[in-house]
From Swiss-Prot:
The modification N-acetylalanine is found at residue 2. The lineage of its organism: Eukaryota, Metazoa, Chordata, Craniata, Vertebrata. It is found in: Cytoplasm. One of its GO terms (cellular component) is cytosol. Keywords: Acetylation, Cytoplasm, DNA-binding, NADP, Phosphoprotein, RNA-binding. The keyword RNA-binding applies. This is Zeta-crystallin. CDD domains: zeta_crystallin. It comes from Bos taurus (Bovine).
Length: 330
């Protein structure tokens, strides 16, 4: 390490495993931006379920060890590399991805994954945009190809992606139904775009949804936990309905006939299959939502960097989501 190189605190993962493999280090070198890269002084970083899958080694993304987790940071540009024209030191920004990892005091990011954070949103909200809103937008507009007037059920609507999906769906003229498992979660869902909300812990909640939507069924289901809900989802769909799988934590048995009779479809979505051009399209639509005011991230549990292990335990095992989980750096 060069003499005088600036150091920072960061979470490092030296082996794949449980939350306990997240190690806080205070002697990590601050990265230096290269061509088309920016260095961000991180104020907050989003914690996403995918972070835990990657950490455990069960995800198809397997970073070289050791690595620092974290995709969606919000902060202030500290330095820019060569050929960066869209940003300068001092700009407020958020990201959809980082190069060096977001669970750190500084994060390196490619300039095409960095976006201006409007003054009306604080850094906590900025850290809740990247993965949740871009994923929800891709699921609804790109994968499901929703149309105004259609109905959408957000199955697991009180977390980061769920709230984003409710807000986007309402803004685009859909009839929005959501589910949540706690009273607080249900309140948040109704406050953020849903016309109706159901408690998915109740034994008869599927019957209540069926009664609400009538014989036609639901046009689109945004599914956060497919290994639990997919079979029920197929029975809730309308003719030609679509289930978009955003999250799953295991396997499930389904009856393919349930798709045949309604000519329905199941489609998985992953944000990082998006092209640069698609990211630009998503960003333009979401930036408009920020300006108009319908895009307003809801912040849930907040943890200091040194509590990252607890955050990873809670995001998987909590009784019910209530907004986007974030790590605070400053």
């Amino acid at each position: 390490m060069a003499t005088g190189q600036k150091l920072m605190r960061a979470i490092r993962v030296f082996e794949f495993g449980g939350p306990e493999v997240l190690k806080l280090q205070s002697d990590v070198a601050v990265p230096i931006p290269k061509d088309h890269q920016v260095l961000i002084k991180v104020q907050a970083c989003g914690v996403n379920p995918v972070d835990t899958y990657i950490r455990s080694g069960t995800h198809n993304i397997k970073p070289l060890l050791p690595y620092t987790p974290g995709f969606d940071v919000a902060g202030i540009i500290e330095a820019v590399g060569e050929s960066v024209s869209a940003f300068k030191k001092g700009d407020r920004v958020f990201t959809t991805r980082t190069i060096s990892g977001g669970y750190a005091e500084y994060a390196l990011a490619a300039d095409h994954t960095v976006y201006t954070l409007p003054e009306k949103l604080d850094f906590k909200q900025g850290a809740a945009i990247g993965i949740p809103y871009f994923t929800a937008y891709r699921a609804l507009l790109h994968s499901a190809c929703v149309k105004p007037g259609e109905s959408v059920l957000v199955h697991g609507a009180s977390g980061g992606v769920g709230i984003a999906a409710c807000q986007i769906a309402r803004a685009y003229g859909l009839k929005v139904l959501g589910t949540a498992s706690t009273e607080e979660g249900q309140k948040i869902v109704l406050e953020n775009g849903a016309h109706k909300v159901f408690n998915h812990k109740e034994a008869d909640y599927i019957d209540k949804i069926k009664k609400s939507v009538g014989e036609k069924g639901v046009d689109v289901i945004i599914e956060m936990l497919a290994n639990v809900n997919l079979s029920n989802d197929l029975n809730l769909l309308s003719h030609g309905g679509r289930v978009i799988v955003v999250g799953s934590r295991g396997t499930i048995e389904i009856n393919p006939r349930d798709t045949m009779t309604k000519e329905s479809s199941i489609k998985g979505v992953t944000l990082f299959s998006s092209t640069k051009e698609e990211f630009q399209q998503f960003a333009a639509a979401l930036q408009a939502g920020m300006e108009i005011g319908w895009l307003r991230p809801v912040i849930g549990p907040q943890y200091l960097l040194e509590k990252a292990t607890q955050a990873h335990e809670n995001i998987i095992h909590s009784s019910g989501a209530t907004g986007k989980m974030i790590l605070l750096l400053n």
